[in-house]
Structure formats: C-alpha cells, structure tokens
Amino acid sequence: MSELLSFALFLASVLIYAWKAGRNTWWFAATLTVLGLFVVLNITLFASDYFTGDGINDAVLYTLTNSLTGAGVSKYILPGIGIVLGLTAVFGALGWILRRRRHHPHHFGYSLLALLLALGSVDASPAFRQITELVKSQSRDGDPDFAAYYKEPSKTIPDPKLNLVYIYGESLERTYFDNEAFPDLTPELGALKNEGLDFSHTQQLPGTDYTIAGMVASQCGIPLFAPFEGNASASVSSFFPQNICLGDILKNSGYQNYFVQGANLRFAGKDVFLKSHGFDHLYGSEELKSVVADPHYRNDWGFYDDTVLDEAWKKFEELSRSGQRFSLFTLTVDTHHPDGFISRTCNRKKYDFDGKPNQSFSAVSCSQENIAAFINKIKASPWFKDTVIVVSSDHLAMNNTAWKYLNKQDRNNLFFVIRGDKPQQETLAVKRNTMDNGATVLDILGGDNYLGLGRSSLSGQSMSEIFLNIKEKTLAWKPDIIRLWKFPKEMKEFTIDQQKNMIAFSGSHFRLPLLLRVSDKRVEPLPESEYSAPLRFQLADFAPRDNFVWVDRCYKMAQLWAPELALSTDWCVSQGQLGGQQIVQHVDKTMWKGKTAFKDTVIDMARYKSNVDTLKIVDNDIRYKADSFIFNVAGAPEEVKQFSGISRPESWGRWSNAQLGDEVKIEYKHPLPKKFDLVITAKAYGNNASRPIPVRVGNEEQTLVLGNEVTTTTLHFDNPTDADTLVIVPPEPVSTNEGNILGHSPRKLGIGMVEIKVVEREG
C-alpha cells in the first residue's frame, strides 16, 4: 500500500510542477533533487532486493561502502550497468518534463505544493522507511528488556545419551519443499522431512541472513551483530567470547565436536567461531584436499556436496565405532547463489521450470538428493538408534535464478529433526525463528530449553510468538548484542606479532591486515575479507579528521607516505588523519610495540583530496621506482605504460591468467634497447612445465622453458624495430582454483612470474 501511495505522490508532484509551477531556478532545483532522491531510493531498494532478496538490510549498508566481490560477481555486472544507465535516463527525462513549461511565470503556491508532494513521496517510500530503521538501529543504546529475555543455559547436559548429526543446507529454505509450487523438486529429502519433526514456520530475522550469521543464530541463540561487518569476522581471534553456545555445552558434556564443509574454513571466520565454542576438529577445503578421492573435483567455493557428504559419512562411521559421544556438523555449498553447482554423482542434474531449465532449481534437486543419501546411510546403520539428525537451511536463498519464483510463496527456513531413539512424525506450525534451533536441539538432547534469545519449539515460547514486531525488536536489541563482544572502546598501545600475523590492543586480538577508526569512545575495526574492499579503498571513505591506524604490507601505503618502502612486503603501521598528518612505521621486530599518536592539526582539504585520490588508484595503475618488474607487489615500474594477462599479486609473485588475456603483454613507455638481455625469474603451472614458451619482442622470438620450481633464465634479444612491448605466450593455460580467492571463478594459469628485468647490452 505504501508503495502505491508513494508513487502516486511522486506522480502528482511531477505533473503539478511541470504544468503549473512555471519558471524558477531554485524551486526547479529543489523539486528535482527531492524527486531524484525518490528515484535513487527506489532503485537502491530494487538493487538491494536483487542481491539480498530482503530489501535494504545490514548487508546492503556494508556493501554500499565497500566493493562487492565473491561468488558470481560477473553475473551482476550487466544488471549493475543497466541500473546506472537507467538512473541517468530517468534523471534526464525528469529534468526535461519539469522544465516543459519553463517559459510560464512562476507560481509560488503550485511550486510549494509540488515540493511538499515530492517530500511526501520520499517519506512514504518503503526504501526510506527501511533506511531510517537501519540508521536507528546503528545509533540506539539498546533495549532495557534485553536482559530479561537473554538467558544463559546450564553449561552441561546431564547424562547425555544421543549423538548429534547437524546438516546445514546452503540456502536450502523450506519453500523449495512445496510440492505444489515446485513439483518433484525435492522428493528424496522431502520424504525424510515428512518422516520427522518438521517445523514449518521458521522466520529469518535481521542478523541471521547469511551463512555465518545463520550458524551463530542457530548455535548461540543470538543474531550476528558485531562492531564490524559479519563476513569480515575471519580477522577476529575469538567470537562472542563471553557467550555459551551449543558447541560449548556439548564439549562440556563429553562430546567430541566435528565440523566438515567443502569451502575454506577461514571464510567469514567460521574457524574462529567454531574453535571459540567447543569444536576441536574442523575440516574444510584445505584439510580435505589430502584425503578426498579426487582433490581436483571442485567448484568455485570448494569441494562439491557429494565429496563433502562422503567424508562426513566416513567420519560418522569412524566416530560411531569408537563409542565416543560426538556431534558431527556439516555444511553444503552446491546451492550457493547465484546459480549453484551440480555434483557429478547426482541422478537429478536438471530441473525445468516455467518451460525452461533452471540452474538454481537443478542445484537444489541435486543437493537434496545427496543430503538424503547421507541421511539414509545413517538410518540404515546400527548406530541410528543413538543418533539425532537435524537438517536446516543456514538462511533463506539470496538472489538466484529461482528467486523470483520463491518470492511468490510464503518463505520460511528449513528445520526438521529425525530421532533414531524415538521416531516422531509431525508437522509443527508454531511461529519460530533460526535462534530457536539450538535451544530445540539442546532440549532434545536432555539439556535446557533455552539458549540466548532462542527457545525450544517443543517446550518453550519463541520470541517470534511473544513479539508481533520481532524484526523491529531484534534491531532494538542490536546494541545489547554488540556489547556481548566486550570490544574495547579505546586504543592507546598495541602490539604486532609477526609470527602470528596478529595485532593486540586493550585485550582484543585481530588478524592482519587491519584498518581501525579510532575516536574518543569507540574503536571500529575494518578487516579485509573476500567480500570487502581492500583496506586502502576503505580508508578512502574516512572523513578528513577521522583518526586511523592502518596495519598492512608496506608497499600498499608507500605510494602515499613512504616511497622508500614501495617494494617492501614487510608489515608497516600508518596512523594519523587523511586531512592532517600521517606517519608510517616499519615493523622491524618479531614482537613490535607501538602507541597511537593523533595530533590535533589543522585540516588541509587539498591534502585530504590528494590522499583519497591516491588511495583509490587501482592496482594495475600504481607505479614504483625500480629497475625490474617485481611481481609480488601491486603495480609496475615507472617505465611500464600498461600490462595485461597477469593476475593479482601473491606473496611469491603473480600468475599469468588467460581469463584476463591469452598472453602476458607488458608495454613500456619507450622503445626497448636495441640489444638487451631479458632476465626472467619464473615457474610454470601444470602442463606448461617443460614446454617451449614463446617470448616475443617485435619480430624477434625466443623460447623459454620452465619447470614447476622457480628458476632464472636469461634470453638475448635484438630490437632493430624499436619495439616497446614484451609478449609471453603460455602454451596450455590450466583452469584451476589453485590459490584462488574463495568464491571467484577459476583462473587459467600458465606461468608464475617473480621478476622480469631488462638489461641493456653494449654494442
């Protein structure tokens, strides 16, 4: 209803101003600005829905100030370009319409009415309401009743008798199991769901809407609200350190806790969270690659679901035979947006909807088949009678190719329980949310029926039942939940541990690199993660007077304030204000101690603009002084005009990447010498080893042969044509996720370059 009212007010404002207001520059500018704000808000809402499926939420607030990287980003480039072009066209059209009768005399009354209607359209828009609520949630002090509803359970289960298998299905919401809406999509897992305790109304609340947040909510009974963006939590050293979570209770009760997934455990800090709360045995892509049958059988995120669930079954067998009480948690990945992935062992590889194949539905149908096969193995085993199996989604599906069809349904998260000791078949329609999952499991295992803000759906009353406005209530509790981190409010002294790559201050520890915004009563950590912008881009968003401490590789800050460190990959500490004074200190000891020293200087806006512009220079445009191309730092020597076909810097150097160009091409600003030696320090990847690799300068070609280890080769070139470009052509680039950023598409690697040097020969 508010959408219609908002649009009606917008339309009325446009029509009244265009046909009645007449000519006046000030009123035109004011009305166009407000109407333009309406357009921007609604396009933001549309774009946010495209990415999150949940309008403008915490994730969007973070994304608006950071880059969106990760799985399938290329899928979103075209829609993003479309939005920008559409916005430009709408603004142009709006200005043209408003000035249609600019030759008529100005009418104050109609101008005022048009402006008021425009303001009303903004105020009535859902986008404005969502942003207002989000901003309020950032500034509230908390809610006085939080302590009354947040309850810590007993730290142990008396006389535990059941083992636990807990399966998180990535984005595998209950909506997919509606056979009328999506016929025969989930027959195997749907049949198992109908055999157990099926909770049909599990809400998704703020702070529970992405994987690590869903895990925290289901195991600790609280949303993931933190003094930093949730997916960046890989940088913290402990996770809600004061809270009692399900894993803590299980460990205290004699359980050995295991977690198995196909992706890297470090992503979003899952390893930190689990280790902080009772899990001593963790298996992710790094741990599994030495034990799986085919370590090369991977998708963009890690190992496919069939591989992961096979390993989970082996672990279940091993632990069951040992007689040791255990919990086994596992997380799938094949249903990750935007398209999902199809395991090769599936029978259900294709699902058509709306008359055409749909990749997301196909991934769901395949993944549920794998999960069902895993559960059926457990059910057929002699250990099932001592086992409780839980299946839940980590969160609702984000924008994937099935999303528009999901949105036509009443959407809920998946949560069902199969008890080997006490078979129960029932669908429970009680209102609940993700935070109730852990409390329900704890209740079944013989523990308390509450956990944080969660309540058992078998014997307690969910917050979703107590509060009709539970989403607003959850946001009101946000400051209280953030305080549970016990995060420091000041930073005066700090220590950098080079062996552990950690920084410590005021009792808190963070992984490096790290950027901190420091004010009188708050220290805001801004870690670097797969989903965040590089720290220098985040720093560029700071205000001129914001105090910062930035710990990163020296070369990343050298171009601003320490050019002598432009080739150093050591740690450096920079602090100051972008509009004031900055200092850079080289970390030259294993345990390096520093102090914050922010001077109250006069702000220089020209200096601020220069710093921001430099911080925003993209990696490939950075230039440094050197007599060779050093590949383990960003940018290139000053003599290089441009280059292509080369991947990002890594600690040792850079790979060629055929996804960025079939050949490595380095163009210099001036012609290369008439006679020179080309000294190449490099290695080959995969089938490129021991193969002739053409290296060309102008019309001359030499052959380079590399092995899998780094070697240095000197090639002799004559350059009579004054060519200025060096070309290297890897013979057989290999598509691989080796060393890739989690969630990115595979790279096509050919050669790994450490250094290339041009040495002029006499004569």
UniProtKB/Swiss-Prot annotation:
Gene symbol of the encoding locus: mdoB
Compartments where found: Cell inner membrane
Protein name: Phosphoglycerol transferase I
Pfam hit, one: DUF7024
Entry EC number(s): 2.7.8.20
TM spans (from-to): 1-21, 26-46, 77-97, 108-128
Origin species: Escherichia coli (strain SE11)
Gene3D superfamilies registered for this protein in UniProt: Alkaline Phosphatase, subunit A (3.40.720.10)
Top-level taxon: Bacteria
Membrane topology: Multi-pass membrane protein
GO molecular function terms noted in the UniProt entry: phosphatidylglycerol-membrane-oligosaccharide glycerophosphotransferase activity
Keywords (A to Z) from UniProt: Cell inner membrane, Cell membrane, Membrane, Transferase, Transmembrane, Transmembrane helix
Any one Gene Ontology BP term: glucan biosynthetic process
Pathway(s) of this molecule: Glycan metabolism; osmoregulated periplasmic glucan (OPG) biosynthesis
Primary role: Transfers a phosphoglycerol residue from phosphatidylglycerol to the membrane-bound nascent glucan backbones.
Gene Ontology, cellular component aspect: plasma membrane
Similarity annotation: Belongs to the OpgB family.
